[in-house]
A protein has these predicted regions:
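Beta-strand elements of well-folded, non-transmembrane domains
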Residues: 81, 120, 295-299
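Alpha-helical scaffold segments that mediate packing/assembly in large oligomeric complexes
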Residues: 94-191, 308-315
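Glycine-rich loops and low-complexity Gly/Arg-rich segments
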Residues: 100-104, 140-143, 227-231, 267-269, ...
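Intrinsically disordered or highly flexible coil/loop and linker segments, enriched in small
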Residues: 61, 83-86, 147-151, 155, ...
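Residue-level recognition of alpha-helix termini/interfacial anchor residues
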Residues: 24, 296, 303-305
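Extended oligomerization regions of viral-like shell subunits
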Residues: 47-50, 70-76, 154-295, 308-315
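Assembly-associated, polar helix/coil segments characteristic of icosahedral protein shells
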Residues: 1-105
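Short helix/loop capping segments that flank catalytic or ligand/cofactor-binding pockets
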Residues: 79, 85-89, 98, 125-127, ...
Length: 315
């Protein structure tokens, strides 16, 4: 037997949502009443949510590198705080066991709201693909806000970013100069990361910093940078892929300039479905109609030792 569809996956709910968008939520069909969100607005149809997630993954480098989980409530992750140890014993000798201890990481739900504006002419033009436009705009706005928080967030009312002083990535190398990174320091950064994490490790930095990395040469005069040989594939440094983010801070004295590690240990918790609501009368005076998308999300680096930072020396 086929599993019955969730009401969010039905064609009638999706068409009801499109009609509501086109009428600025002045016409609400009965089927849409099922999707009223407790925080205001209407839960987006499954197809919309899938397309939003696709845009989020394309636009947000941290989502493409991290691990996303869908949660219905507070999500707890148990992390082994102590590792098992092996010991040689004499024949017939007594076995000794240490007590395993666990730390607990909790993914909560922080509310993120983004708004987009549409002209009334486009809203009522049936030839205009309103769905695609709104989902693309919402997706990009949500992705930008998420990426910023997943990198720089302080954990208060927002996710905890990889650069957080507490709970973020660990400092692997501090540069000798406050304004310059050397090839040797990048090599040291790679080997500051424990071997198991190096297998899936990548670099992450601001574009301006990556421009400097491209110029670095080793002791034999060879560039560390290795251009990609395949379209769509990232370039590499020392054999490791390089990703950029506009939200990774520019190199500055006393601040992190480059992150290197296995970012799959950055866990992203999506709480439930996203919702859409109208912004009543906010733009009424200039012929614009506003919509707001809401989501609840959290993010944390569950193993800080999985990502290492190259930190600039203080001035």
């Amino acid at each position: 037997d086929k599993k019955p569809k969730s009401f969010l996956a039905t064609d009638s709910y999706r068409s009801g949502m499109l009609n509501a968008l086109r009428t600025n939520f002045r016409q609400i069909s009965n089927v849409l009443q099922e999707g009223i969100d407790a925080n205001g607005g209407y839960l987006v149809p499954d197809e919309y949510d899938s397309r939003l997630i696709q845009v989020l993954n394309e636009e947000n480098v941290m989502r493409s590198l991290g691990t996303a989980v869908t949660t219905s409530g507070e999500h707890k992750i148990n992390i082994a705080a102590t590792k098992p140890a092996a010991a040689w014993i004499e024949e017939g000798g007594a076995l000794t066991f240490g007590d395993a201890t666990f730390d607990q990481i909790i993914l909560d739900a922080h509310k993120l709201h983004v708004a987009v504006k549409v002209t009334e002419e486009l809203l009522y033009d049936n030839a205009f693909n309103l769905e695609n436009y709104i989902l693309e705009q919402f997706g990009k706005a949500l992705a930008n806000a998420e990426e910023d928080a997943f990198i720089n967030g302080n954990g208060t009312g927002q996710p905890l970013g990889i650069l957080a002083e507490t709970g973020g990535a660990q400092v692997g190398v501090t540069t000798k100069s406050s304004g310059k990174v050397t090839a040797d320091e990048i090599i040291d950064l790679v080997y500051s990361l424990k071997r198991p994490y190096r297998k899936n490790a990548v670099f992450l930095a601001n574009d301006a910093c990556v421009a400097e990395l491209r110029k670095l040469k080793d002791s034999t005069g060879q560039y560390l940078w290795q251009p990609s040989l395949q379209a769509g594939e990232p370039d590499r440094v020392l054999g490791y892929k390089v990703y950029t983010s506009a939200y990774f801070p520019l190199p500055a004295p006393g601040k992190a300039a480059v992150a290197f590690g296995d970012f799959s240990y950055y866990n992203i918790g999506d709480r439930g479905s996203r919702s859409i609501a109208e912004l009543k009368e906010l733009f009424a005076g200039n012929g614009m109609v506003g919509f707001v998308a809401k989501e609840r999300v959290d993010g944390k680096l569950v193993l800080p030792e999985a990502v290492k930072l190259l930190k600039m020396a203080s001035a």
